[in-house]
Amino acid sequence: MRVATLSIALLSSMALMPMKTQAKIYAYPRADEVIITSGTKTTRTALDPNSIKILNWNMYKGSNSSWENDFKSLTKDVDIALLQEAYLDKKMTRVFREHPTMRLEMATSFILASRGYVPSGTAIGSDVKMTDLGYRISEPREPVIRTPKAVTYAKFAIEGHKEELLTITIHAINFVSSKKLMVQLNDIAKVVRAHKGPVVWAGDFNTWSKKKLRVMHELMAKLELTEAPFGPGRMKVFGNVIDFVFYKGLELRDSYVLPEVQGADHKPMVVEFYLP
């Protein structure tokens, strides 16, 4: 999302369309087609506990001209990439497929039928084999266009540790009340509560109101997840930050934003963790 006003204008224009016209714009995958796999075979079976480097980035569908080069550069030096607004048009499909080190798994939120049936969703990439992979489709839908948001999650083994790392990438439902946002967040919280081990939950939470920020932070506190601190540069809507990284069961070594990267409207965020 570039700015809120553009998205609101889109919703307004959609509201004027007949329902049959809107139905032709979006399609939805069968359950066995939600996950789309790209990239290469993984080269490692476990994360190095001395350094676990994770990228969080809403890629704005790869629309900006420098996205491809930025994506290749950013993913070269991280263990895990937690991605939002993955958009498997010809360009992004090629870039994902040709990635030299990462295997990428995308959970499809919806398919843009009007643009040649292009799947869009959230994705996790890594050169480490995933021990588990799953997704959640939001029960709440965006108003008017009636599209859901998919959350992707994956687990990774850690060398010398019995417990695995759970990673979650979210692109939260947007033009809804804080109550409907909480429906989506609480659904994902079930995955967190069921996991015994360290957790990283990151993404675009679409917390563009104070109330949404409050309910998100209240839930993270209940889950005993800590917010990673970042300097200036994160995406804001109506003056409120919407991109976050939360974690538990890990030691934080570093966290920073890369404001100079122009590959998307959101700025990439990088965190590095370790386990003693």
Model features per residue range: what roles?
Residues 28-66:
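Boundary/entry segment of secreted carbohydrate-active catalytic domains
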Residues 52-59, 71-95, 166-170, 184, ...:
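Active-site beta-strand/loop signature of hydrolases that rely on acidic residues for catalysis
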Residues 1-5:
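Positively charged n-region of N-terminal signal peptides that target proteins for export
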Residues 57-60, 83-86, 107-111, 127-128, ...:
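Active-site-proximal beta-strand/loop segments in catalytic clefts of secreted hydrolases
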Residues 24-41, 80, 84-164, 259:
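Structured beta-strand-rich core segments of catalytic domains in phosphoester-bond hydrolases
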Residues 22-42, 155, 192-197, 206-276:
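Metal-dependent phosphoester-hydrolase catalytic domains
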Residues 7-15:
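Bacterial N-terminal signal peptides
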Residues 51-67, 110-114, 141-145, 174-177:
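Acidic/histidine-rich helix-loop elements
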